Regions:
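Terminal amphipathic alpha-helical/low-complexity segments used for targeting or macromolecular assembly
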Residues: 1-175, 298-310
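Structural signal for interior beta-strand "rungs" in well-ordered beta-sheet cores
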Residues: 177-296
Length: 310
């Protein structure tokens, strides 16, 4: 027996034993989990319905938008309903097929009824981005290229399903956006209108975070929970901060804890660490470290070795 066959055989036997010992490796009750690929496809294609002039190459979308929207929504309704039904059946073993189908249809109907409202809220988010970023040349640029808007778009869809307690799918959606943008918004967070994330990489918004209107976050901001060993005991407890209206939080600031409230019209400076409430109309900043600036002894050439010693 050659080395490859021997190694594969041993690995197969060991893996199979692990499958038998731990049920987590296999779906329960001979039922499927929702398809991550199918859920992501729905997210991608709904974007073409929300912003048809940007993410759909068919010229008919511009000439006959009503027919385009109806055609796409019919197809997407069925595909999302199928995944919701699968998720419900997996999470609730006692649920019968007929009951799951009826509940999935109810949830899906409510989701699609709210799409026009989501579209209007996203336009407000676009406006917030345009007002908040002098580098933005147009609103079209924001819609077509800004990662912050994409993460917010996915969150606003996922949040609708989260409120209906749909298992698995909301998190699949937002983790897709997380992987694409580096922005981690839990679908359970509550976020008001005119929300803008500038740059975005490293932003974290926890499940029980509440964010008001006209809030702007920069890269690396964490709206998180204080570390605890209680784990699942805190699953339904508010663990993340509340951010009131008209707040700006600069890069790499951390605002932590369920009892922490940042009041209206407040500015949180970069690299701050906040675990207690901040009153309205306040500026918070960390004391700057002392900079040491030395004049070099002579002009530096490209071949010089830098010496940071005295």
């Amino acid at each position: 027996m050659n080395r490859k066959k021997d190694v594969i055989l041993r690995a197969t036997v060991a893996l199979t034993e692990n499958y038998k010992k731990e049920e987590l490796f296999m779906p329960k009750n001979n039922r499927e989990l929702p398809s991550r690929a199918a859920v992501i496809d729905v997210v991608k294609e709904l974007r073409s319905v929300i912003f048809p002039g940007y993410f759909w190459n068919d010229s008919a979308a511009k000439v006959f938008p009503e027919y385009f929207a109806e055609y796409r929504l019919n197809d997407l309704y069925d595909r999302l309903k199928e995944q919701i039904e699968i998720a419900l059946l997996y999470a609730q073993p006692e649920l019968e097929q007929e009951g799951a189908e009826e509940e999935a249809d109810r949830i899906c109907a409510g989701f699609f009824e709210q799409l026009p409202e989501v579209q209007q809220r996203l336009l407000k988010d676009v406006q917030a981005g345009f007002d908040g970023d002098p580098a933005a040349k147009s609103k079209e640029e924001i819609i077509s290229s800004y990662p912050g808007l994409f993460a917010i778009y996915v969150y606003r869809l996922a949040h609708l399903l989260y409120k209906e307690e749909v298992p698995y799918i909301p998190r699949i959606m937002t983790e897709y956006a997380h992987g694409k943008t580096g922005i981690d918004i839990n679908p359970g967070a509550t976020i008001g209108d005119y929300f803008f994330i500038d740059h975005g990489t490293g932003v974290v918004i926890g499940e029980t975070t509440e964010i008001g209107r006209n809030v702007k976050l920069y890269q690396g901001v964490t709206l998180g929970a204080l570390s605890t060993r209680q784990g699942q005991q805190l699953a339904n407890v508010k663990r993340h901060p509340t951010i009131r209206d008209n707040v700006t939080i600069y890069s790499n600031a951390s605002v932590l804890g369920g009892e922490t409230v940042v009041g209206e019209n407040t500015i949180i400076g970069g690299n701050t660490f906040i675990t207690e409430s901040v009153p309205a109309n306040t500026k918070v900043s960390a004391k700057s470290p002392e900079l040491v600036i030395k004049k070099s002894r002579s002009a530096v050439s490209k071949t010089d070795v830098w010496d940071w010693q005295d």
